[in-house]
Regions:
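A generic structural signal for alpha->beta connector loops
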Residues: 78-81, 94, 139, 176-178, ...
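Short beta-strand-to-loop junctions in surface cap/lid or active-site-entrance loops
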Residues: 96-109
Length: 204
């Protein structure tokens, strides 16, 4: 319960307010100013016995974050309506690939996007506004993958889902040469891992 409260409280605080709070109390480490958001996060959150965190607590944390991200709308939204189509990579419809198509598309290239969250948190829905905004600004179709999360799904589940997404796109006559990989935080790591995977495949 305490963890959920702290997450909700932390997500409600605007960045500009955090910077004002910390402006007269800067921490300097190795000649660098410590990021105010990180400083507040460390201050608010108690040391957690991570081995005692249960799956139910993780699910509650996910739910709290998703609720805040979707209700607060902290990302910029596109000016024009973006067409969104949900595709599924499996028969059980457990792996979602959401397609974003802007009003005007400049080229045949597409972006395959992976959300961040330490492979444990977030989803296509927490990053929905952000990806739609990018699609409009870049005038490019973007596919956002809702890969399976840990700890329920062990490594390499997320990577396998990402491989499935590329194969699905290729089945739709989209050349791999026209696919750019992109992600934030853990999503960036997944994009790099996927690149490494296909680079090794090409060497075989």
């Amino acid at each position: 319960m305490l963890l959920n409260f702290l997450v909700n409280f932390y997500l409600l605080i605007p960045v500009w307010l955090i910077k004002i709070i910390c402006i007269f109390n800067k921490d300097i480490k190795r000649e660098y100013i410590f990021d105010p958001q990180s400083k507040l996060l460390i201050y608010l959150f108690p040391k957690l016995e991570l081995q005692n965190v249960k799956n139910d607590e993780i699910k509650n944390l996910r739910s709290a974050i998703e609720k805040r991200r979707t209700n607060l709308r902290i990302s910029k939204k596109p000016k024009k309506e973006i067409k969104k189509v949900d595709h599924y990579l499996d028969k059980d419809e457990s792996i979602l690939l959401r397609e974003y198509s802007p009003y005007k598309v400049d080229n045949k290239n597409i972006i395959l996007f992976f959300h961040g969250g330490g492979y444990v948190l977030n989803s296509v829905f927490t990053h929905d506004d952000m990806v739609a905004y990018f699609s409009e600004k870049l005038r490019t179709r973007i596919f956002s993958l809702d890969y399976k999360l840990a700890p329920e799904n062990k490594f390499p589940a997320a990577l396998e889902n990402a491989i499935q997404a590329v194969e699905w796109l290729e089945d739709k006559n989209i050349s791999s040469a026209n696919i750019s990989l992109c992600g934030d935080s853990a999503g960036g790591h997944l994009a790099a891992s996927l690149t490494h995977h296909f680079t090794n495949e090409d060497k075989k």
